[in-house]
Amino acid sequence: MSAQVRDMTKGSPAKLILLFAVPLMLGNIFQQLYTMVDTIVVGQVAGVQALAALGAVEWIMWMTLGVSTGVTQGFSILISQHYGAKKWNDLKKTVAHSYLLTAVTAILLLLISQLAARWLLVLLNTPDNIIGMSLIYLRIVFCGIPIVAAYNIFASVLRALGNSRTPLIAMIIAAFINVVLDLVFVAGFNWGVAGAALATVTAQAFSAFYCFLSVRKIEIVHTDRDDFAKVPGLNRKLFGLGAPILFQNVIISVGGLAVQFVINGYGFLFVAGFTATNKLYGVLEMAAISYGYAVVSYVGQNLGAGEITRIKKGVHASSFLAFLTSAFISIVMFLFGKTLLSMFISGDTEQTSQVLAIAWHYLSIMASCLCILYFLYVYRSALQGLGNTMIPMLSGVVEFFVRVGVALLLPKLIGQNGIFYAEIAAWTGAAVLLMISYYINIRKFA
């Protein structure tokens, strides 16, 4: 069991968080690798229009993924608290009911997303010359929603128990499979965006299966029929933790969709430039996500064990580590960002130069303010680990209004490049709310 779980209630907070976060960072690197390979292969083989087609669905994809990750992350909060408190019977029942709720959510999400796909693309003012390719990509990827949900719940259980190594291995497997299949389906068979979508879904299936096998090896979360029996209040408690995170992700996504609507009105070249930078956004954000997962598990376990002082030390250590990491990534982007962006773009020389200029402008703005995003993740996750998912949900509402407001108003004042500042403004508004709320909430446990 010791190889599959990690007790985060003992030992150096900074060391524990770093040991937990680093495998997740490596896993995110591999996840970004196969996302970037999708973009590079499609952009280089199928051209700028195909690249724009992928970009046009970016926020729609993020929204559907956000629903799945939101509910499972909420479930993991209670799982980590029971593990920290050593309540083994409650732990098994919580895991079992998390499986049931995840399955129901996945089925509903699959049906809704398939029905709404075309409507969303039309609503977003997707350019006529790319909407067909965008719809093909969405239809195929949406078929994999149950697979993504399975991966998310199994990975969430593992992370709640302090295991970040297994999700890393799963991401490495998925990245390797995705790269190979991209080359076969897109470059070899010339299937375009459909091939990229098939490669992604297949890779996700292998990562989900690997995490499932790993969870099966952990005795303390072995579930039987009795664990699935109705427990008064349990589903409500799980949904009470998961629903606000789900709503938070959805409202952030809706804000992103509103921004995408504005961007789509600027033409496919602007969409392509925006897309190229958004593919690197995953690289900018990957360590922040990792620290977020680490903080949720760390705070949840220590709250279950009643170790409030350790929570404070862990959050401070995480903030410092997040700042250093964001500074390093920003420097890398300023040094090599243009080279990385150029990998995504091919075609007519005049068009590619315009796309690259748009992409570089956006990337330089985000890299300059990256530390704000990292603080946002740390403090949002700390609140979630404390069992407070309402304030993080409200931070999503703040992100929505700030992002949409800036996207609609600033371009009218300084031109279309003003839309690039919508993301930074949204980060800042949410981060301020979360930091203030954390310090107010932690005093209640002192």
Predicted feature locations:
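Short alpha-helical transmembrane segments in multi-pass integral membrane proteins
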Residues: 1-21, 79-144, 188-243, 299-368, ...
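N-terminal transmembrane alpha-helices
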Residues: 8-45, 62-74, 78, 103-110, ...
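Transmembrane helical elements of multi-pass membrane transporters/channels
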Residues: 19-38, 140, 174, 203-207, ...
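Helix-terminus/linker motif at the lipid-water interface of multi-pass membrane proteins
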Residues: 29, 33-52, 121-128, 184-191, ...
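Interfacial/gating helices of multi-pass transporter permease domains
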Residues: 42-62, 128-133, 193-194, 234-241, ...
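Small-residue-rich hydrophobic transmembrane alpha-helices
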Residues: 51-111, 148-167, 273-337, 373-395
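Hydrophobic transmembrane alpha-helices of multi-pass small-molecule transporters
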Residues: 63, 178-182, 207-212, 283-286, ...
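Short runs within selected transmembrane alpha-helices of multi-pass transporters and secretion channels
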Residues: 72, 140-159, 167-175, 196-209, ...
